[in-house]
Amino acid sequence: MGRGRVELKRIENKINRQVTFAKRRNGLLKKAYELSVLCDAEVALIIFSNRGKLYEFCSSSSMLRTLERYQKCNYGAPEPNVPSREALAVELSSQQEYLKLKERYDALQRTQRNLLGEDLGPLSTKELESLERQLDSSLKQIRALRTQFMLDQLNDLQSKERMLTETNKTLRLRLADGYQMPLQLNPNQEEVDHYGRHHHQQQQHSQAFFQPLECEPILQIGYQGQQDGMGAGPSVNNYMLGWLPYDTNSI
């Protein structure tokens, strides 16, 4: 019984797709080699995987020479503006470098997805163990950095606390000195004010009691006229009568 027709379509299962690619690729490379040996043909085979990895086979000594021959056959004799062999070599080298970088980029993306817990199905036991060690190492580094950051913050806060404590202590000392300085300069301020007011009042009383004597050109003996008023008090002439000699003959 013959084998049924296989429907050609993209394989959805990733693992099955990779397995099929590896088998068909090896078979294709084997067929190209057999064709070049059995038929003495110049065969060049270039394969790129879906991840950008390059697989090639060339029956001649140089893939570049086969490509130049292919270009001549398809596009005729090279024109003056056609790149030379050196230019093609540079272009091919650049392309290979690009493929290497792309492969590296894909590997880094794949590693990143694995670290995030994605696409872990195709990984083997050793790869999973290696991934676990990487995660443990990364976790230790993160914890160490976090601890160091917290210690730095704690040291900064302690330094600020010491500065604030010193500032508070200095302000308290200045405030205490400000209260004590007026008392040291004038400790009996209230007494001085009291005596000052008393002395001023005594001066006013003395000035009111002792009136200045007015010198008159004519000495008047006896009381002054009644126009001075009864409540004016004794005058200077009245005081003089007390000590003048009393002349009985004048009466």
Curated annotation (Swiss-Prot):
Every copy of the K-box domain together lies at 91-181
| Disrupted-gene phenotype | Triple mutations in the SEP1, SEP2 and SEP3 genes result in the replacement of the stamens and petals by sepals and of the carpels by a new mutant flower with sepaloid organs.
What Gene Ontology terms for biological process does this UniProt record contain?
Answer: cell fate specification; flower development; mucilage extrusion from seed coat; plant ovule development; positive regulation of transcription by RNA polymerase II; seed coat development; specification of floral organ identity; specification of floral organ number
| Residue ranges of every copy of the MADS-box domain listed in the record | 3-57
One GO CC annotation: nucleus
GO terms, molecular function: DNA binding; DNA-binding transcription factor activity; protein dimerization activity; RNA polymerase II transcription regulatory region sequence-specific DNA binding
* Keywords from the named record: Activator, Coiled coil, Developmental protein, Differentiation, DNA-binding, Flowering, Nucleus, Transcription, Transcription regulation
Q: Which SMART domains match?
A: MADS
Stretches of the chain forming a coiled coil according to its record: 94-177
| Localization | Nucleus
Q: Superkingdom of the source? A: Eukaryota
Q: Note whether Nucleotide-binding occurs among the keywords.
A: no
Is Membrane one of the keywords? Answer: no
Q: What functional role does this protein have?
A: Probable transcription factor active in inflorescence development and floral organogenesis. Functions with SEPALLATA1/AGL2 and SEPALLATA2/AGL4 to ensure proper development of petals, stamens and carpels and to prevent the indeterminate growth of the flower meristem. Interacts with APETALA1, AGAMOUS or APETALA3/PISTILLATA to form complexes, that could be involved in genes regulation during floral meristem development. Binds specifically to the CArG box DNA sequence 5'-CC (A/T)6 GG-3'.
Oligomeric form and interacting partners = Forms homodimers. Heterodimer with AP1 or AG capable of binding to CArG-box sequences. Binds AP3/PI to form a ternary complex. Interacts with AGL16. Interacts with TT16/AGL32.
Q: What is this protein called?
A: Developmental protein SEPALLATA 3
Chain's gene name: SEP3
